[in-house]
Amino acid sequence: MLLSDRDIRAELDSGRVGLDPLDPTMVQPASVDVRLDRFFRLFDNHRYAHIDPRQEQDELTRLVEVDPDEAFILHPGEFVLGSTYEQVTLPDDLAARLEGKSSLGRLGLLTHSTAGFIDPGFSGHVTLELSNVATLPITLWPGMKIGQLCFFRLSSSAQSPYGTGANQNRYQGQRGPTASRAHRDFHLTRIER
């Protein structure tokens, strides 16, 4: 079930959902707007001949920090990682989904490629997969609204929330955009004829 603004406020007020820092004006009818942080992870395309998710490739990206009042320019066709300004913390019976802002999408800005789902139990800054599909550069300002979180109540609490037991996952507690850690639990099924 998708939570309404009433339910979202109740979850925030009780402390079960954490958004830090919280700006109450960001609560929308069925979501909460989130803002862009000042950290970006750029791809160094000359370091490797190709990207292999099975291998650790530490030099694939580099962290760039802009001043709080300095813009980051995302060029046409460019893909960078960013993150939410807010640290998001979910209980074991709520999941969230990151969606883009319609007004930014109409300018050609995509906020996530595939990873819009946030598991119950997650705590950290949400990494954004920012792409410019427009034909002009897009100016990104730290602190600007960049997306929105929708919250979903599970039918029951997760037995193994994110960050616990076998799910002590790769991105729990992350601060800033975190590079891929796909190599840590890469799974490959042998495909038979």
UniProtKB/Swiss-Prot annotation:
Its EC number(s): 3.5.4.30
UniProt entry keywords in alphabetical sequence: Hydrolase, Nucleotide metabolism, Nucleotide-binding
Entry function: Bifunctional enzyme that catalyzes both the deamination of dCTP to dUTP and the hydrolysis of dUTP to dUMP without releasing the toxic dUTP intermediate.
GO molecular function, one term: dCTP deaminase (dUMP-forming) activity
Biological process per Gene Ontology, one example term: dUMP biosynthetic process
Ranges of Polar residues composition bias in the record: 163-177
Annotated protein name in UniProt: dCTP deaminase, dUMP-forming
InterPro entries: dCTP_deaminase (IPR011962), dUTPase-like_sf (IPR036157), dUTPase_trimeric (IPR033704)
Subunit structure: Homotrimer.
Residue numbers annotated as active site: 129
The reaction(s) this protein catalyses: dCTP + 2 H2O = dUMP + NH4(+) + diphosphate
Binding sites annotated in the UniProt record for dCTP: 101-106, 119, 127-129, 148, 162, 174
Basic and acidic residues composition bias: residue spans: 182-193
Gene name of the record: dcd
Region described as Disordered: spans on this chain: 163-193
Signal peptide per UniProt: none
Name of a matching Pfam family: DCD
Species for this entry: Micrococcus luteus (strain ATCC 4698 / DSM 20030 / JCM 1464 / CCM 169 / CCUG 5858 / IAM 1056 / NBRC 3333 / NCIMB 9278 / NCTC 2665 / VKM Ac-2230)
Family indicated by similarity: Belongs to the dCTP deaminase family.
Residues under site feature: Important for bifunctional activity: 116-117
Listed pathway(s): Pyrimidine metabolism; dUMP biosynthesis; dUMP from dCTP: step 1/1
